[in-house]
């Protein structure tokens, strides 16, 4: 929550800390008109197309049918457009990635793209774009930025919605200066890493619960009398 609030404050409202640690725009920071974006942005900022800021790994995606997944049950998450669909016995990605729904359910109730942050060993099907920033130091900014794009600006189709590579990569984004991006990552990344550790601990405990509960139910395991 804090990461999203800080993103909105700094990169949407433009009230990042200035040289005097005061909110930039609210304190009269210089704003200039950007013709490509058709809006005012802070004086030292610029713009770019998303294709110049991110790398896509869609060519490495491999879809598996439900029948195939049934034959390959395992421990590695199998991701679709909106979340984990199954667990399989192999993986094609290992590390931190950002997923953005490509088709089917492409946006949430508020009209923003469905974006997931994943890490570890996993498998991703062909219904989610797989993304990292060209400078992987800016992963947290990229995650929040993608979540803030109005989906209607990159979607096509009236009934069956789709976010194509072309539309995604052609999106025109505000590009903050690198110093501010570094500051954002320095604040947010430690919080995110702590959150990841908590999620991993919860998942480990849930797995232990699921393994022990049937044994307790049928008397194969005894509770510690202490």
Ranges and model annotations:
Residues 1-6, 26-63, 68-80, 174, ...:
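Non-catalytic DNA-recognition/assembly elements of restriction-modification systems
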Residues 37, 84-86, 105:
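Short beta-turn/strand-loop junction motif enriched in small, turn-promoting residues
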Residues 63-64, 83-86, 115:
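Glycine-rich, charged/polar anion/phosphate-binding loops
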Residues 80-82, 91-147, 152-171:
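A short beta-sheet element
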């Amino acid at each position: 929550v804090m990461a999203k609030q800080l993103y909105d404050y700094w990169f949407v409202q433009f009230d990042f800390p200035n040289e005097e640690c005061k909110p930039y725009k609210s304190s009269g920071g210089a704003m200039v008109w950007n013709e490509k974006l058709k809006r005012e942005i802070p004086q030292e900022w610029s713009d770019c197309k998303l294709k110049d800021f991110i790398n896509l790994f869609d060519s490495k995606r491999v879809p598996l049918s439900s029948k195939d997944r049934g034959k390959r049950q395992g421990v590695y998450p199998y991701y679709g457009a909106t979340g984990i669909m199954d667990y399989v016995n192999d993986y094609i990605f290992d590390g931190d990635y950002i997923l953005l729904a490509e088709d089917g359910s492409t946006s949430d109730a508020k009209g923003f793209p469905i974006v997931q942050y994943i890490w570890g060993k996993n498998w991703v099907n062909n219904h989610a774009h797989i993304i990292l920033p060209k400078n992987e130091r800016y992963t947290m900014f990229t995650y929040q930025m993608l979540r803030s794009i109005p989906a209607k600006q990159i979607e096509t189709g009236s009934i069956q919605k789709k976010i194509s590579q072309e539309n995604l990569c052609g999106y025109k984004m505000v590009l903050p200066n690198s110093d501010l991006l570094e500051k954002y990552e320095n604040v947010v990344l430690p919080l995110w890493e702590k959150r990841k550790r908590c999620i991993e601990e919860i998942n480990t405990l849930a797995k232990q619960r699921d393994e022990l509960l049937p044994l307790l139910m049928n008397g194969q395991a005894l509770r510690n009398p202490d």
